[in-house]
Amino acid sequence: MSTTGPQDAPTHWRGILRHLGPGLIITACIVGSGELIATPMVGAEYGFSLLWFIIGGCMIKVLVQVELGRFAISKGMTTLEAMNTIPGPRLVVSWLVWCWLFMFVGILFQLGGIVGGVGKVVAELGWFAGFGGTGVFTIDRLIALVVSAVTVAILASGKYKPVELFSIIMVVLFVVATLFALASLQWSPEMAAHSISWGDIREGFQFRLPGDFSTAFAAFGIIGVGASELIYYPYWCLEKGYARNVGTPNPTNVWYRRTQGWLRVMRIDACVSMVIYTGATVAFFLLGAALLHGTSGVSNETMIADLSKMYAPLGEAGLTIFLVGAFVVLFSTMVTASASNARLLADGLVLFQLKKPRSEKERAKLLSQCCIAVPLVCAGVYLFVGAPVSLVLVGGVAQALMLPFLAGTALYFRYKQTDKPLQPSKVWTALLWVSAIAMAAVGLFQFYKKLT
């Protein structure tokens, strides 16, 4: 992070590389429950035919992500502060911030499901088979408590750098684990029956839609950048120092030129992360299509176990590597999502006037307290509710319902709040409309499904 005043953005790739980071944190957050559970489920149900849909679902939402980041960097405002400027009814805060609060509660349930998923994956490894009891003291619940405690230890300082470093390590690990999982299908004689052919890939790009589209449409709300990650991203851009490097908004040519430079860095950061999480998501989809399509009894509840059993022909080592990869994916989401939601909680408490920090030191203390509280609350949710996949789906529905509002917010910022020199091109704007319409359609579909 920058510790100085305004400075011009780097133009050489080495300098740009040093300033990447927010997107990697989001990537570590994204490749989690949606990719490990929902995406293979789409492959299991529809085979390879929806590969194009999975790729599009990952790529299209990045336009809204960049637009929210553009506003944060140019105005120096957090996402909730930005949402609080949206016109409409107010009760202490904007109606849109109240919508976020509903989603936030759903996300706490989702994180409870994720920490439970980590517990179940570690339990599957069998390393702690002699531990645990009954009721709330089963092995998966005890592991969930330990995972939450480790998460608190990583995040307790409330600082940016530990989260970025952790995210980079996790991204490297789950990319390696995913490549192993796919490579074993292609080159291991024991897995030859499940190998993926070019014919399978061609089938995935015939742009066909199945008659019953519900599972795929539900997955669209979770895969790639979900509503929560769209809200998280500007926070990490601010903490990385993009807005500080831009300086106080000042409608001069020098300021606009400097801002355009840092917006370019932000776009590169977002696109690099998109390439990584799209690749990982596609890999999980291909695993589901290759290993589980056409099998009976596949469900969300048993997805990880079903996938892991398919690797039994590789022996103990292959199964262990797959489960370790699943652990890395879920644990990275737990840590980075907890860090992100802690920032939202601290910001929300201030906006709702429940906390009034009088200095940066007091605000940092509040953030540290929230970094401790969020993982512990999520562990409590899993201990007393259980059913990790149901908890994950509650958060997924809450996020999907928020997507139309975020799509509209991005368009509002584009047309009403962005200075003309900083506005995107006509092509970008057209793609932004496509992205916003697709996101709104997903949210409305989820709402309809719940009503019926």
Which residues are covered by each model-predicted region?
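Transmembrane-helix boundary/entry motifs in multi-pass membrane transporters
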Residues: 9-12, 47, 74-105, 136-137, ...
